[in-house]
Swiss-Prot record:
UniProt GO molecular function: signaling receptor binding
Protein name: Toxin Tbo-IT2
Any one GO cellular component localisation term in the record: extracellular region
Modification Cysteine amide occurs at: 92
Key words, A-Z: Amidation, Disulfide bond, Secreted, Signal
Signal peptide: 1-23
Superkingdom assignment: Eukaryota
Tissue: Expressed by the venom gland.
């Protein structure tokens, strides 16, 4: 293989891995039965089964451990308006 082919192959593999990681955040089997509310009440999470105790992306949160998958809880400069957002490949697995 030439260097150009090798580099192109590595880029394609990297993109495929990134797409697979991002798809994990969008697919939540528990969410197929019932759509989540716009503003999630943290107290109501305790009444649900263990598997669905996470907040999906773009929903309000208070800490990163509440967010599903590789999402992290990000707030604005003043520590308000916190939402679960994609943490990227680096944040995946860290809570």
């Amino acid at each position: 293989m030439t260097m150009k082919t090798l580099c192109l192959s590595l880029i394609v593999i990297g993109v495929l891995i990134l797409v697979a990681v991002k798809a994990e955040d969008y697919v939540n089997i528990n969410s197929l039965e019932e759509a989540p509310e716009e503003n999630v009440n943290i107290n109501n999470l305790e009444e649900t089964p263990e598997e669905s105790r996470c907040i999906q992306r773009h929903r309000s949160c208070r800490k990163s451990s509440e967010c599903c998958g590789c999402s992290v809880c990000q707030c604005n400069l003043f520590g308000q308006n916190c939402q679960c957002k994609s943490g990227g490949l680096i944040a995946c697995g860290k809570k």
